[in-house]
Amino acid sequence: MRLPEELLERARDIHSEAPSHRIKLDRVGSFGLKVPVEFKGFLLLAEADVWVSLPEGRRGVDLSRQVEAIYELSNPPKDPFSLCREAAISLLEKLNYADSSGVSIRFDAPLQDGESLKYYGVEISSIASDEIINKIRVEILGMTACPCTAELIRAYKSSEIAATHTQRSLGILEVSTKAEHPDPDKLASIIERAMSSPLRTYTKRPDEGGLVIRSLSNARLAEDVVREMIHLFLEEFGHLPEDTHILAAVRSMESVHMHDIYAERSFSLDEIRKEISSH
């Protein structure tokens, strides 16, 4: 049932009224929208959040215009980087009382893994105000082997390669920059290379043995992985603006403890370069 237009014209516009308390809100929007995106030749179903700031003199936002901003641009589907940027700009145009807007798109990205595919998590965001800040977050699982236990076993057995406990570890790289979004595949590669060993979706017995030997020969603490991620990021993305902000983190799902191990470093490119050069 659709209400008559004359009835809608007589109804008050609640959203445009003054609020009881004149307090500005940073973000008001629609979260969990489903949108199609094209990514590296694949058509994927992604989840999107859209929001705008709300001035202190307005009670609510026009939610339908928010949804319209991203749905218009996703038909036909386009790449998530363009969709984020264009939708953030469109939000400010459609809701001109807002002084900032943002769009985030989340999806599982396919990555070639030998004869099969594996997937890693990607979140792409754009925040628009006087300028546009682009942000990307990549999460992928890898394997880490504990060097502390390996050393104890090596001392006991005097062997060249010592047994130790291994675990799946979740590596995270998050980048906020005024430049274009970095390539998520390259970020995923940095995380995998920083681990003791990558994980595989499809393996046969010789492959499994090779992965374990590689992991044991490259035992790393969670702290080692974070530092290696930072080192590899600087090699690959050192050209980004100096005020680019990065989060590098690892959550290790321990096999011999009843808890996880977590390590992170948050930094700007300018900050980390000065720190490294001072040593």
Swiss-Prot record:
Write one Gene Ontology MF term: iron ion binding
Instruction: Give the main EC class.
Output: hydrolase
**Cofactor(s) named in the record:** Fe(2+)
Q: Which UniProt keywords apply?
A: Hydrolase, Iron, Metal-binding
Top-rank taxon: Archaea
Please write the reaction equations for the catalytic activity of this protein. GTP + H2O = 7,8-dihydroneopterin 2',3'-cyclic phosphate + formate + diphosphate + H(+)
Query: How does the cofactor bind to this protein, according to its record?
Result: Binds 1 Fe(2+) ion per subunit.
Point out the annotated site residues (description: May be catalytically important): 146
Stated EC number for the protein is 3.5.4.39
Q: In which pathway does it act?
A: Cofactor biosynthesis; 5,6,7,8-tetrahydromethanopterin biosynthesis
- Alphabetical GO biological process terms: tetrahydromethanopterin biosynthetic process
Question: How the protein assembles, per its UniProt entry?
Answer: Homodimer.
Q: What protein name is recorded for this chain? A: GTP cyclohydrolase MptA
Origin organism is Korarchaeum cryptofilum (strain OPF8)
